[in-house]
Swiss-Prot record:
Domain called 4Fe-4S ferredoxin-type: residue spans: 48-80, 90-119
Membrane topology (UniProt): Peripheral membrane protein
Listed GO CC annotations: plasma membrane
Localization: Cell inner membrane
Annotated [4Fe-4S] cluster 2 binding sites: C70, C99, C102, C105
Cofactor needs: [4Fe-4S] cluster
Protein name: NADH-quinone oxidoreductase subunit I
Any Gene Ontology biological process: aerobic respiration
Broadest EC class assigned to this enzyme: translocase
Gene that encodes it: nuoI
Subunit structure: NDH-1 is composed of 13 different subunits. Subunits NuoA, H, J, K, L, M, N constitute the membrane sector of the complex.
Keyword tags: 4Fe-4S, Cell inner membrane, Cell membrane, Iron, Iron-sulfur, Membrane, Metal-binding, NAD, Quinone, Repeat, Translocase, Ubiquinone
Length: 180
């Protein structure tokens, strides 16, 4: 062992002591998760929910656009029809073990029925428990868009009624009558 090795070893020891002392009294980067809340950005995409209209009905019209837009194919649903001609999902299933939370389903949904919430705690012990059915996904409120009602906004005709004759629906505008 030479004098150079001793000096280098001593310098290394001093540098290590200095770094330990420096980091011992600095602010910690680790978050104590359950006790401390985690900061989530305003546009964070977490768990998917299905919302309802302001009158309490399901917003989803089972158009299947969300399942087509999903890049991993984790959404499956089956369309059914009520007696007045409105569509609704007979079953709606999302496999969260495959979902990548990209938000494509939310963008594709014409009725704003699918919305992503900031909830990220989806840990389960069994993989089967990560498959959510419609009953698990439906929430009681309208979500981000409280006043939006698809059937009122879209002006879609319902069986047995002309456009504008349905409940709380405005008469259609005659666009050609507005021309000079």
């Amino acid at each position: 062992m030479t004098l150079k090795d001793i000096v280098v070893g001593f310098g290394t020891q001093l540098r290590s002591i200095w770094m330990i002392g420096l980091h011992a009294f600095s602010k910690r980067e680790t978050r104590m998760y359950p006790e401390e809340p985690v900061y989530l950005p305003p546009r964070y995409r977490g768990r998917i929910v299905l919302t309802r209209d302001p009158d309490g009905q399901e917003r989803c019209v089972a158009c299947n656009l969300c399942a087509v837009a999903c890049p991993v194919g984790c959404i499956s649903l089956q369309k059914a029809e009520t007696v007045d001609g409105r569509w609704y999902p007979e079953f709606f299933r999302i496999n969260f073990s495959r979902c990548i939370f990209c938000g494509m389903c939310e963008e594709a949904c014409p009725t704003t029925a699918i919305q992503l919430t900031p909830d990220f705690e989806l840990g389960e012990f069994k993989r089967q428990d990560l498959v959510y059915e419609k009953e698990d996904l439906l929430i009681s409120g309208p979500g981000k868009y409280p006043e939006y009602n698809f059937y009122r906004m879209a002006g879609m005709a319902i069986d047995g009624k002309d456009k504008g004759d349905a409940e709380n629906e405005a008469k259609p505008i005659d666009v050609k009558g507005l021309l000079p």
